[in-house]
Amino acid sequence: MTTTDATRLTGLDAALAETTDALFALQRPDGSWEGRLSASPGATADVLIAMHLADPVGCRDLIERGLAFLLRTQGADGGWGDDVDTEATLNGTALSVAALALIAPDAAAEQISRGWARVEQFGGAEAVRDVERCSLAVLVHFYLVLAGLMSNEGLLRVPIELALLPAPLRRKLTFAMPTAMAWGLMCAELLPAGRARAAINRAATPPAIAYLEGLVGFEGPDGGFVESPMMSANVCIGLTLAGLRPDIVRHCLKYFRATIKPEGAWAVTRDLEVDATNFITAGMQHVGLGADPRVAKAVRWIRAAQRDEDFIWTGAPPGGWGWGLPSGWPNSGNTGDAVIAIAGDGHDVRDEQVRRGAQWLLDQQNYDGSWSCFAQVGRLATMDPSFAMVGKARSPKVLYGPCAVMSAEAVSALGLSGMCPPGDPRLTAAYRWFAKVQHPDGGIDNKWYLGRTAGTGSVLRALADVGLAGSPVARRCISWLRLTQNSDGGWGDALGPGRSTVEETAMAMLGLCAAGVDPAEAMPSRGAGWLVEHRGPDHLWRPSLLGVYFLELLYRHDHTANGYALQALARYRELVRRGGTTSGAFARPPWTATPDPGKTV
């Protein structure tokens, strides 16, 4: 080890010690981390409209807090973004204006006027009706009609006949389905219908209600639809205006009270506690703290979060993980990351929970070798009912089909758990899919984060985790990351050229370190330096607005940044210690504990 290496390790040791201490201070008594999502003006406006329509008296205190949040977060240009203090968007601005105009037309008259002027700058009513400019066109247009700011000309109907699809097809519909069912019921009640349409409405109403009833049973007394305040608001509005199922409406109202944030707002979905705990636990294991009782407690919490029942709404088998409790929907990303965390605790597929999680991933693998988020995709792309709401079914921003990040997490989990040894045909199929979707320059897109850095770094990490660090796809990923590193040493193309983010820098570094690049080379050294230097006074990192949710809404998540950055620095330190060599053949990573099938859980 050179003097330079020793100096580098000393700095990394200090930074990792400070960061792990800071994260342990945030750990909850049950062993998990909160995984806080940022407050969303758009989601807050949606929830406010729902409470105003369903129970304005009983929800008065929540409504007042939400209105105060919107009033104090309006931008200087009159608009609202997808998050506080971010660039105004048509979705965020129009939703906020609609809520204020519907609930407080006099008290907020000046703010409404400024907000509508910003909507006009986006293109006004014409832009709202244009699904290419307003991804939430149906929601936004309808709310502005309710508020008296737009006419109902061109208002789109949400087709309740989606409820009549055969079960195998209906299971392919993604997590916008509850909104589609509730708004389909609303449209059936409110919009004019001829004889044929009326017959369809009558036939589709019972299965649509049955679908929502079933989800309430899954979500439990403390859950909301899709564990999302925004989705729950849409269901609440649809059923309220349809005059149906006041019990389900009350269920939603209870959920709003449970999920309001301290600032008086709501996020697009419930806090990502499973993501956070998976990411941070893996990071602690990379650091070498796997035997720490606090990390062991986190692993026990992850185990307890595994779903033991079929999820009939997507066709997913038992054994998966969702993003939150009690009822986040089982998905490939959370399941892959949970398997990785448990494997890092010294358990391979001889462990029943690891085996079930890994088998869940194999059962969900698509025909082409990829993975999607919720449902297995056949040769026809997964249908998302949001296409029926916005009219752009083929848009890659709407379809929740195969995703490079989801696929990478699944591949890493299958390799690190021992479920799929090198050369396994399931891994070969995944590799072929990565090769197919990789751009000629080496970059790889993904569904759930903006930009290409997240996809490229994640795929590189996964390939290295299963012994394919020297493959052509991996080499092209490295080349792309080399060419796209920003002048400040970080990575980031999601927010614009040259704008480095913690998440993208960490994902790039994870891929490079897993692939065994020379740690003395400027590229990884500068990346690690960027991460160390961009911690805050609390020794943690500030998240960026690059997570993609329903219909192009964006969010930021604190522990995606913290967890990935922790992993990246720890893996870089390991790279420095071993000199950057990699055999290119699969071997159990050095940060994982020795497999012990008899280990007490």
Would you name each region that the model predicts?
Residues 1-601:
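Preference for long, amphipathic alpha-helical scaffolds in soluble/luminal domains
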